């Protein structure tokens, strides 16, 4: 009974098992994801590109030619746009910033270009007979006389005049720093032989008369498709992550001031003093100090000079000091001691935070080198000042007290003026700055310092010695560009979605007039991918218009330079920026076109998403990640995905071509269009004409053949009755039999009748042959259909048979298994019961055995 019950229940078990297996397979199947292209996503990468300049040059003197050539820059934007990027952290490194290198190259190029048309002073590399200019009357202190003794020399020399073969003697005043003695052999006279400095190793070029070195703020701007990230952290040290980031198109106005030791007229720190270095533990690295409060420095050259010109050749004039009116006094700079001491105190506080709170900070003078390094060098109204800063850097800051920092008086820095300047940007070039007439004074603000730290074995553990440094102008530019870096906008984004490009259809490709506004749309960089994808239209609408506007501004700046013989470095950069912006836009549009996504903001594709690229779920991607995070996730696979998109689009276009070829057969109604009917009639006329022509040819050949045989028929269509055979006489006796069935022969006369008869015969022949062919085809189809149907029925019955056999076999096997299991279970239960009974009867057997023994 148990076995029969198991057999009945197993039929239901089989059905339920099959149903559960199918449900398990359905539930285990994962939904397939597909690659989707998005245009206008806020994604960027670090880049190196050509920057161009913007400047408001109209606010400055137009009488002179500014060495910075800011007239060639585009006008500054009156309403600059700055977009704060929320929830964005970006790494900056001011020590590896290509913007600094570009500015260095630009300033070098501008200096070189401004000196190209100027006079070369090679004829002045002659022997100079010089004496000290000793006019020092009406001075109140003898110290002044000693200080200025030998500062200015009156030199005579032989020079070629405007007539080349004529040499005359001229006199000129030179600064002591600009001449070097040749020999001191003469002891009987009060003059010595000198020559101009740098004559032995450099080409000296005189600055053109109307060249101005007055620094004008220059804004560096990026082309369309690029942007500048700006770090707004108030205590940012120039290296590392920045959490307060914004994006701008141009930097702030940077004054290209060439100076050493002290940074002038730069930007100030917003809170405390900030010190920056590439590596504080490496004493070879320069320390850039940014002050939070500026220190005024006022410089003066009190002498009232006049300027005269000496002709040193045809069309070449050398400008020198004519005479000095009034007292000969040293140039000097004034700094408030109280302000300077307060500044040093804040710097010391930051240095101790960096190097140790128990350190003694010592400021000392420069350790030596070129005059540009030893002294604070800068340009003041066209004159190059070299000021001794020993009084500024000559104190010790201990933990309890400070030495040499007391007082509220004014620090007076003695300065010397050089007219022959060794060009800071390259070796082998020198510049002669013509003297400026009248008294000179200029006021500047000290906004930063360049320091170096002493190292080696002579430094004690509790003392750090700092000295003024400089000389590498990159540090000057770096002090202003530390918070910027250039990025390249990547508006093309790729992400997985559930949507697939389903239908292959014909589609007109419109010109893409949408894109990613290179500033505005980056404001959504901190939002999730899902939130950004809902506003792609707004984000992508202004790219082309932004490019066009920028192109117009650049073009106007270039047109303003057409009167020049050659473009400045700014003009070249503007041309490069114009080309680069268009190239960037065309590249993105080309990729969209290759992928079949032209004119689309969201473009589905037929490329399946590979889990090896990223195995994150859709919810994690679209709800928790920003586009920047997602771009870093799949950055290594971007090129692979691009290749697959291109291959998929090529296959789709091939399928589209095949589909279009099938479209001609899909629309049968086109067969009845008037165009097709005219084509049919033309073909019919050609066929009939060909047949008639063949008929005529064969008729002529037949006539020729019969004429050669000796006779000619009465008509082309004469048909003689065919005689009956001997078994069929023409008639029957007594006129009672069947009549003769031979038809009368049609005798046709005329050419048209002949054509009609031939055409009629041809049509009848064609009709009979086509009818026979259709009957054969119909019979063949009928036979094949019947046999095919029989074969299908046979295979269906065979399939049903094998399915039934498999089912019966499975049921039999399962039934046998169930029976075996059941029988085995019964045997096990029976054995267990017997063992249990035997155990229960042990005491009875023992009792019975004892009873037998007792009996």
UniProtKB/Swiss-Prot annotation:
Which segments carry the region annotation Immunosuppression? 573-591
Molecular functions per Gene Ontology:
structural molecule activity
Identify the InterPro entries for this entry: Gp120_core_sf, Gp160, GP41-like, HIV1_Gp120
For this protein, what post-translational modification is recorded in UniProt? Highly glycosylated by host. The high number of glycan on the protein is reffered to as 'glycan shield' because it contributes to hide protein sequence from adaptive immune system. Palmitoylation of the transmembrane protein and of Env polyprotein (prior to its proteolytic cleavage) is essential for their association with host cell membrane lipid rafts. Palmitoylation is therefore required for envelope trafficking to classical lipid rafts, but not for viral replication.
Pfam families on file: GP120 (PF00516), GP41 (PF00517)
Q: Where is this region: V2?
A: 155-199
Looking at the keywords, is Transmembrane present?
Answer: yes
Chain spans, region CD4-binding loop: 366-376
Q: Which residues cross the membrane?
A: 684-704
Motif interval(s): YXXL motif? 711-714
Short motif (Di-leucine internalization motif): ranges: 854-855
Q: Please list where the region (V3) is annotated.
A: 299-332
Q: Where is this region: V4?
A: 387-415
Give the GO terms filed under biological process for this record: clathrin-dependent endocytosis of virus by host cell; fusion of virus membrane with host endosome membrane; fusion of virus membrane with host plasma membrane; positive regulation of plasma membrane raft polarization; positive regulation of receptor clustering; viral protein processing; virion attachment to host cell
The record's domain comment reads:
Some of the most genetically diverse regions of the viral genome are present in Env. They are called variable regions 1 through 5 (V1 through V5). Coreceptor usage of gp120 is determined mainly by the primary structure of the third variable region (V3) in the outer domain of gp120. The sequence of V3 determines which coreceptor, CCR5 and/or CXCR4 (corresponding to R5/macrophage, X4/T cell and R5X4/T cell and macrophage tropism), is used to trigger the fusion potential of the Env complex, and hence which cells the virus can infect. Binding to CCR5 involves a region adjacent in addition to V3.
- Its family? Belongs to the HIV-1 env protein family.
Protein name listed in UniProt? Envelope glycoprotein gp160
Instruction: Identify the gene encoding this protein.
Output: env
């Amino acid at each position: 009974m148990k076995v029969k019950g198991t057999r009945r229940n197993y039929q239901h078990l089989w059905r339920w098992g099959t149903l559960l297996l199918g449900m398990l397979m359905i539930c285990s199947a994962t939904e397939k994801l597909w690659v989707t292209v998005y245009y206008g996503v806020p994604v960027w990468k670090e880049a190196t590109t050509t920057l161009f300049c913007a400047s408001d040059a109209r606010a400055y003197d137009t009488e002179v030619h500014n060495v910075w050539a800011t007239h060639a820059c585009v006008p500054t934007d009156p309403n600059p746009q700055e977009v704060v990027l929320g929830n964005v952290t970006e790494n900056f490194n001011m020590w590896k910033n290509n913007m600094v290198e570009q500015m260095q190259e630009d300033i070098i190029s501008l200096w070189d270009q401004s000196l190209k048309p100027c006079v070369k002073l090679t004829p002045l590399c002659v022997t100079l007979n010089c004496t000290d200019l000793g006019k020092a009357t009406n001075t109140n202190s003898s110290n002044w006389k000693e200080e200025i003794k030998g500062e200015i020399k009156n030199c005579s020399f032989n020079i070629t005049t405007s007539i080349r073969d004529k040499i005359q003697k001229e006199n000129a005043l030179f600064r002591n720093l600009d001449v070097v003695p040749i020999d001191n052999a003469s002891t009987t006279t009060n003059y010595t032989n000198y020559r101009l400095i740098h004559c032995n190793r450099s080409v000296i070029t005189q600055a053109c008369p109307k060249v101005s070195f007055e620094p004008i703020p220059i804004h560096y701007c990026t082309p369309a498709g690029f942007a500048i990230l700006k770090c707004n952290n108030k205590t940012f040290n120039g290296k590392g992550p920045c959490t307060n980031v914004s994006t701008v198109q141009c930097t702030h106005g940077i004054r290209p001031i060439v100076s050493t030791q002290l940074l002038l007229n730069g930007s100030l720190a917003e809170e405390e003093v900030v010190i920056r270095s590439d590596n504080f533990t490496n004493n070879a690295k320069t320390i850039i100090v940014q002050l939070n409060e500026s220190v005024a420095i006022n410089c003066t050259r009190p002498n009232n000079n006049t300027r005269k010109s000496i002709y040193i050749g045809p069309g070449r004039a050398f400008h020198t000091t004519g005479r000095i009116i009034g007292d000969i006094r040293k140039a000097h700079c004034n700094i408030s001691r109280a302000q300077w001491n307060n500044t040093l105190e804040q710097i010391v506080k930051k240095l101790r935070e960096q190097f140790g709170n128990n350190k003694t900070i010592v400021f000392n003078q420069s350790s030596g080198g070129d005059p540009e390094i030893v002294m604070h060098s800068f340009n003041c109204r066209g004159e190059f000042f070299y000021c001794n800063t020993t009084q500024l850097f000559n104190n010790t800051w201990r933990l309890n007290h400070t030495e040499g920092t007391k007082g509220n008086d004014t620090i007076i820095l003695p300065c010397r003026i050089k007219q022959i300047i060794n060009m800071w940007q390259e070796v082998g070039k020198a510049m002669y700055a013509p003297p400026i007439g009248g008294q000179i004074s200029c006021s500047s603000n000290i906004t930063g310092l360049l320091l170096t730290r002493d190292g080696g074995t002579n430094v004690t553990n509790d003392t750090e010695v700092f000295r003024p440094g400089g000389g590498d102008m990159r540090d000057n530019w770096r002090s202003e560009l530390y918070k910027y870096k250039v990025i390249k906008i990547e508006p093309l984004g790729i992400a997985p979605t559930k949507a697939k490009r389903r239908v292959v259809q014909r589609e007109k490709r419109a010109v893409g007039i949408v894109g990613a506004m290179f500033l505005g749309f980056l404001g959504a960089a901190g939002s999730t991918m899902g939130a950004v994808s809902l506003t792609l239209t707004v984000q992508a609408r202004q790219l082309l218009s932004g490019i066009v506007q920028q192109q117009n501004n650049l073009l106007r700046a270039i047109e303003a330079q057409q009167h020049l013989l050659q473009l400045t470095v700014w003009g070249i950069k503007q041309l490069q920026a114009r080309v680069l912006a268009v190239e960037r836009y065309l590249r993105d549009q080309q990729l969209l076109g290759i992928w079949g996504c032209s004119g689309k903001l969201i473009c589905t594709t037929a490329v399946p998403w590979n889990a090896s690229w990223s195995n994150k779920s859709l919810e994690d991607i679209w709800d928790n990640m920003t586009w920047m995070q997602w771009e870093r996730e799949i950055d290594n696979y971007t090129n692979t995905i691009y290749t697959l998109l291109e291959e998929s689009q090529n296959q789709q276009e091939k399928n589209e071509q095949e589909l279009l070829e099938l479209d001609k057969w899909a629309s049968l109604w086109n067969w009845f269009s008037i165009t097709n009917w005219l084509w049919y009639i033309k073909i019919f006329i050609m066929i009939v004409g060909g047949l008639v022509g063949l008929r005529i040819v064969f008729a002529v050949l037949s006539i020729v053949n019969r004429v050669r045989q000796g006779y000619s028929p009465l008509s082309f269509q004469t048909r003689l009755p065919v005689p009956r055979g001997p078994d069929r006489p023409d008639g029957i006796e007594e006129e009672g039999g069947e009549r003769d069935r031979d038809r009368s022969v049609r005798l046709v006369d005329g050419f048209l009748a002949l054509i009609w008869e031939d055409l009629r015969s041809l049509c009848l022949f064609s009709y009979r042959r086509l009818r026979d062919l259709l009957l054969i085809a119909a019979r063949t189809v009928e036979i094949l259909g019947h046999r095919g149907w029989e074969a299908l029925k046979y295979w269906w019955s065979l399939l049903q048979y094998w399915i039934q056999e498999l089912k019966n076999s499975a049921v039999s096997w399962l039934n046998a298994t169930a029976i075996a299991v059941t029988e085995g279970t019964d045997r096990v239960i029976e054995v267990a019961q017997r063992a249990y009974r035997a155990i229960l009867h042990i005491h009875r057997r023992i009792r019975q055995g004892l009873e037998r023994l007792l009996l």
